[in-house]
Curated annotation (Swiss-Prot):
Subunit structure: Interacts with UBTD1.
Region (Disordered): 1-36
Pfam families: UBD (PF16455), ubiquitin (PF00240)
Ranges of compositional bias, category Basic and acidic residues: 24-36
Native species: Bos taurus (Bovine)
Disulfide bonding pattern of the chain: none
Stored InterPro entries: DC-UbP/UBTD2_N, DC-UbP/UBTD2_N_sf, Ubiquitin-like_dom, Ubiquitin-like_domsf, Ubiquitin_dom, UBTD1/2
Full protein name: Ubiquitin domain-containing protein 1
Organism taxonomic ancestry: Eukaryota, Metazoa, Chordata, Craniata, Vertebrata
Domain Ubiquitin-like: 149-224
Main function: May be involved in the regulation of cellular senescence through a positive feedback loop with TP53. Is a TP53 downstream target gene that increases the stability of TP53 protein by promoting the ubiquitination and degradation of MDM2.
Amino acid sequence: MGNCVGRQRRERPTAPGHPRKRAGRNEPLKKERLKWKSDYPMTDGQLRSKRDEFWDTAPAFEGRKEIWDALKAAAYAAEANDHELAQAILDGASITLPHGTLCECYDELGNRYQLPIYCLSPPVNLLLEHTEEESLEPPEPTPSVRREFPLKVRLSTGKDVRLSASLPDTVGQLKRQLHTQEGIEPSWQRWFFSGKLLTDRTRLQETKIQKDFVIQVIINQPPPPQD
């Protein structure tokens, strides 16, 4: 597993089964987003695959599964700019951060856990792609009484936005509504709920979202072209 450095590394995680000397300090999680560049430009789908592979295999390198689960939830919360939630998750699991980042963490037994930077933020050279899902929008449901409700989404900028939604709506439709309201291109948006990425074809009713729940929207806006 790679440390938090400017480029990704192909290293396996340090097995935390053998406790190392724990750092003597614990710093709060820093709010700055880590910046890094991939060895090769990767698509959003490739980034998701790398993350899934890591989270699926990390517990196999010993350590405590509940700590890995907490780190995963904290990483998603931090990426969605919900640092209060991320810090609460870390505190609840008694996880300490010697340097204020999720790159290096310790549990209460002194076991060390390292997260690769690609699990904490997307690379600056991430390729934004228009997926087939965007062009193959599922057919509209049979017309019926539309029961709308206010859907709260929290942007990675920290702003909360309310959309008018109904359970049969797809994420792709709601992305376009957010674009109309806030001017954020649908291809820049990545929607997360309960730590899971929502695809454009996912309907709200499939997410089992309830009243007053919040969907996290991470915005990956491409940098302006350089002269």
